A protein has these predicted regions:
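Catalytic active-site module of serine/aspartate enzymes centered on a nucleophile-bearing elbow/loop
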Residues: 242-273
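Gly/Ala-rich beta-loop-alpha elbow adjacent to hydrolase catalytic centers
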Residues: 100, 104, 108
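Acidic catalytic loop of the alpha/beta-hydrolase fold
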Residues: 223-227
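Conserved HGGG/HGGXW glycine-rich cap/lid loop of the alpha/beta-hydrolase fold
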Residues: 14-66
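Active-site loop/oxyanion-hole signature of alpha/beta-hydrolase fold enzymes
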Residues: 48, 58-99, 264
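Conserved alpha/beta-hydrolase catalytic His-Asp/Glu region
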Residues: 145-210
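Short beta-strand/loop motif that positions the catalytic acidic residue
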Residues: 212, 218-220
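Flexible "cap/lid" loop of the alpha/beta hydrolase fold
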Residues: 109-113, 119-153
Length: 273
């Protein structure tokens, strides 16, 4: 069996929690941004599988999971990119493949655009881009109110078939989201939308994506209620060297809802010369 090691490193002045396993070509898994999210919540089942072929690193991004949140730091894409690069530097990783889920995909893209030599290629799952009206699924994440019912409501938008949502999963995310300081941290990282207007969500601009030199594999659930499938089409049209694989009857959790296919596609893509 593959040994997954969880440890703490210093990266960009943040005490950083990460999971690591396997040998070979380095692949970094970047988690999404809902309440109670962490690398473990997004990736625990796929880390040992991907580690059969790759050196897998799955960090908790600054402010999320068990990684430090500094009360006086300004958490924005600039800080998150600097933290990600800090992780690569701390681990001595010159160039890595990235698998990014949702917000993690946007972070991977932002890093690839600002530090192109550090990123080898990208797998983007349910990743926002361009501009689009706030979805009910995104709003439910941002409006999480600190109750177990609120968590159940927020998580209900992720999969297409919500029978995969277990009480244990809700409980685990709820505990993570309500540990001391976590709710305040989440409010700081992801401010709730004001009033009931439909604010615009802004991802990486499509014009910027058109300049991306990297290969990208875009994976998206057709029924995604958090980041609509149309985003994947726009991304595929914009990123010159991209391929798109869409799953029917699948929501925002491709790596959980279509785990076997996800593993096959990512393994094949990351192993290419």
């Amino acid at each position: 069996t593959i040994q997954v090691v969880t440890r703490t490193i210093q990266a960009h002045d943040h005490r950083t929690n990460l999971h690591e396993a396997g040998q070979g070509r380095p692949v970094v898994l970047l988690h999404g941004s809902g309440a109670g999210v962490s690398a473990a919540a997004n990736w625990s089942k796929v880390i040992p599988e991907l580690a059969r072929n790759f050196h897998v690193v799955a960090p908790d991004i600054a402010g999320f999971g068990m990684t430090e949140l500094k009360p006086d730091a300004r958490y924005d894409i600039k800080l998150w990119v600097a933290h990600f690069i800090g992780i690569l530097d701390a681990l001595g990783l010159e160039k890595v493949g990235v698998v990014g889920n949702s917000f993690g995909g946007a972070l991977g893209l932002a890093t690839a655009l600002s530090h192109p030599t550090r990123i080898d290629r990208l797998v983007l799952l349910g990743t926002p881009c361009g501009e689009f009206p706030m979805t009910d699924g995104l709003r439910a994440q941002l409006e999480f109110d600190g109750t177990i019912e609120g968590m159940r409501h927020a998580v209900s938008f992720f999969p297409h078939d919500d029978s995969i949502i277990t009480d244990e999963l809700i409980q685990r995310r709820f505990e993570a989201a309500t540990q001391p300081g976590a709710l305040e941290a989440f409010r700081k990282l992801m401010p709730a939308p004001a009033g009931d207007e439909r604010p615009t969500v802004r991802g990486i601009p499509l014009k910027a994506l058109a300049t991306l030199p990297h290969r990208a594999l875009i994976l998206h659930g057709r029924e995604d209620r958090v980041v609509p499938f149309e985003r994947a089409l726009d991304m595929h049209r914009s990123v010159p060297n991209s391929e798109l694989h869409s799953f029917g009857q699948c929501g925002h959790w491709v790596q959980i809802e279509r785990e076997a296919r996800f593993l096959d596609l990512v393994t094949e893509f990351m192993a290419r010369d």
